[in-house]
């Protein structure tokens, strides 16, 4: 069989391994920890909490709760502020290995806007 005409499932055609490796490299001192790509963050994955955190239905931080943290921890804070910034101290300390986001705009790989763009590229069709 012709080696040049076959699809090799083990080949990294898009160069994603080097992209991820660059995202996993430690940053130097004084280097800005902001994302390396110009990707705007989408709306929060979870609905924003009401202004009254103790209101009916409030269950605390969804991130900590889903990671099975103690109730005393997850009920002590909200995941996001009303303007969408991350409040959870655990998530704020996490850095996305794909885009480098952390702090106010921290997210896990599952909610990374870069991952979502790679999964659903919105390229123009038929030259439009």
Swiss-Prot record:
* Residues that hold Zn(2+) 2 according to the record: 96, 99, 107, 112
Q: Which organism is it from?
A: Xenopus borealis
Secretion signal span = none
Gene3D superfamilies assigned: Nanos, RNA-binding domain
Q: Which GO terms describe its molecular function?
A: RNA binding; translation repressor activity; zinc ion binding
Highest rank taxon of the organism: Eukaryota
**Stored InterPro entries:** Nanos/Xcar2, Nanos_sf, Znf_nanos-typ
Q: What is this protein called?
A: Nanos homolog 1
Q: What GO cellular component entries does it have?
A: cytoplasm; germ plasm; perinuclear region of cytoplasm
Q: Which PROSITE patterns match?
A: ZF_NANOS (PS51522)
| Purpose of the protein | Acts as a translational repressor. Can mediate repression affecting different steps in the translation process: cap-driven, IRES-driven, polyadenylated RNAs or nonpolyadenylated RNAs. Essential for the development of primordial germ cells (PGCs) by ensuring their proper migration and survival.
Positions of the UniProt region annotated as Essential for its translational repressor activity: 7-23
Q: Where are the zinc fingers (Nanos-type)?
A: 60-114
* Residues annotated to bind Zn(2+) 1: 61, 64, 77, 88
User: How is the quaternary structure described?
Assistant: Interacts with ccnb1.
Domain remark in the UniProt entry: The Nanos-type zinc finger is composed of two C2HC motifs, each motif binding one molecule of zinc. It is essential for the translation repression activity of the protein.
Pfam families for the chain = zf-nanos (PF05741)
Q: Which family does it belong to?
A: Belongs to the nanos family.
